[in-house]
Amino acid sequence: MSRLGIMVLTLLLLVFIVTSHQDAGEKQATKRAAVNFRWRRSFTRRAAAEECEEYCEEEEKTCCGEEDGEPVCAEFCLG
């Protein structure tokens, strides 16, 4: 094989390695952003659930969730 052929193959290999490394970095950044979003969403849900529990506790009932932003309280939650 000529030197030119070896240089071309080496260059192609380097391009392949660099692009695959960039793709891995983008995937990792996307995964990190998804985890951060999931954590924020669970934190806000937890805060809303605590508010619902406190509100229904005053009425001596169980919090069954929220509907239109308002806590739903009942003796027993169905479904």
Swiss-Prot record:
Question: Can the keyword ATP-binding be found in this entry's annotation?
Answer: no
Propeptide section residues: 21-44
Determine the domain of life of the protein's source. Eukaryota
Pfam family for this entry, one: Conotoxin
- Subcellular location per the Swiss-Prot or TrEMBL entry: Secreted
Family, similarity comment: Belongs to the conotoxin O3 superfamily.
**What the record says about its domains?**
The presence of a 'disulfide through disulfide knot' structurally defines this protein as a knottin.
What name appears for this protein in its UniProt entry? Conotoxin ArMSGL-0123
What organism does the UniProt record list as the source? Conus arenatus (Sand-dusted cone)
The opening ranks of the lineage are: Eukaryota, Metazoa, Spiralia, Lophotrochozoa, Mollusca
